């Protein structure tokens, strides 16, 4: 990528992220890492890099960047584990994979400062993962995506979108609901187009002219139907409607999940939200933040019937899409539920959801609003170990469970029933009281009570990730902050987990031990 484009991307990203995440409990360094790492991922994934031995200065600079992003209080304790992944067709993703090793067996290096060089791995652990081909050409142009949002929000969202959208061929239609005339913002639109081009995103901007008497978020979102019809492409097999905080783990996997359905027929495909409370309130529909998908024949019918459907508006886009489908189709096109699309209308500590071992995992929503987790950074693992390893649970011999890209948890009193979801969350905004067993029964199954953090459950949470040379390795940093009352000797604690595909000479000490997961 040209230096000018990188500077433009960094400037736009910094401004946009500041405006959108002002009220989100994220460390500023985490988003500095995101802005810097996304261009690195793109450039290194499109051209091969010649591995070279890392110098002490290179290692020190990389360590310094990571430590600054973590917001640690020195001195701190540090452990490091390295995995050498081996993609194989013999392995499939399951809810829980057993690894024949003690993850925390090596005592931590204690009392490190921010200026110390982080200790290297003593060995590399070989781990089989589901097969993927990082060199395979990606073409998901048959999937045409659309989002209704504001100019500032799409500005902030493009870097995260690029994690899963760059270079795929899928067009992104952006309905700018705060811009009735794009000519009035020609310079700003031009900068957004340049930003998207640098990120290899095929983007289309469309203005929105709402009714001055009656307008709503629902009408704005449903206006995508006519916009899709205006920009229809002959190769489109599916239209996908998303929110600006919808994150796809893998667009090829998403398109593969739609393969059983004939796009020449009318289809309305999506997922319910997690809690029975909201389903009872809003009815049976595809929730928009999880992403939902409409076949071309049905989209054409909805676009042609837009004027007839607008009076049905109740204020929410996904409700209006459903009600229009009910109004104009005969026989009625009913919702087809697709597992793996996740609305995540959950509040509070949602670690129980992330650590529940859900599969498939196609989309994640609300990751920067109702809750915060650096999903774009967490997803770096997919470029090195494949999409099926993202949020995969690995259980180790020492009663430790790593949810890849989210957390490392030690259970001092033995493993709980990991087949049950830990009920750490509530079902609505600002609700602290945990719901009853039946609230999530249809979506998550039976649950178990939340464990006492620090006593029954000791957790390190992913706070930062960065690629190594040629995007053939990724460094993950899981952090446990010191808690008042833990004792005078308690410190912030970091577990670095490094993953590599192939050998990167000089980066790690590779005394390989086979700890292949039993899947």
Q: Which stretches of residues belong to each language-model region?
A:
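Extended non-globular C-terminal regions
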Residues: 2-7, 403-519
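Short, acidic, metal-binding catalytic loop of nucleotide-sugar glycosyltransferases
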Residues: 137-140, 159-172
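Active-site-proximal specificity loops/subdomain of glycosyltransferases
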Residues: 176-237, 249-252
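Short aromatic-hydrophobic micro-motifs that form the base-stacking/packing surface
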Residues: 238-242
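Charged, amphipathic alpha-helical linkers/stalks
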Residues: 368-429
